[in-house]
Amino acid sequence: MVDLVIIGGGPAGLAAACKAWESGLRDILILERDKELGGILNQCIHNGFGLHRFGEQLTGPEYAGRFIDMLKNTGVKVQLDTMVLEVTPDKKVHCVSKTEGYQIIEAKSIVLGMGCRERTRGAIGTPGTRPAGVYTAGAAQRYVNMEGYMVGKRVLILGSGDIGLIMARRMTLEGAKVLACVEVMPYSGGLTRNIVQCLNDFNIPLYLSHTIVDIQGKERVEKAIVAEIGPDRKPIPGTEMEFDVDTILLSVGLIPENELTKQAGIEMDPRTKGAVVYENMKTSIP
């Protein structure tokens, strides 16, 4: 029996482990499916992290490193390269790893820190053919920042969330030509700071109330057709613009990683698709 099992070694899991240890808990186990702690922070090589927590500007890996260093001075146990398969309502965690094999870990308490995943092209129903060259912004970020692969040369970004804005800047700095950022809403979904630093500073146009109405290409993306959206949320005929691109990045929102949450029988919020939590962040299972 473990006092606290934390599923996920990203920013939420790391912060939870540090706070639990600080609060006096001594039997803590972090389960992380990747080969290192940090989660999404490891691919966020831009700065802007840590200002509130540490009083200075840090990159994502530096921010994660601060928490990892804090954990080194504790007795928190970490199990990497471990995939959690199931969480039962009676707080049994089923997981598997190369080193430990199949395990069933009983916990007094569980912190769910699985994070989220990106919406894909299929989730938003973008019409057109299905050529190579369409990526989520996060996948492109990992390829460029961690794997060392350039995903394209002429880029159009759909969605103006922060990760899309940041990737507009990153792709430009890596030598690509970002033709535009297209946003279906009449306002941007990202921070004003990111619009200024990632779009305006690089003369990348932002088209509000616009969306992609067609993707063309056989083996690889060749063109993207963009049109203005009317008050009825439908494309306005005659407003189409044609962009010659070989890459489209999607920054169209995030979805909670909630499969384990559902398995545990936790009450779900149909609006957010995540767990219903109370003021102390407890779920419906005490």
Q: What are the language-model segments listed below?
A:
Residues 1-286:
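Residues forming the flavin
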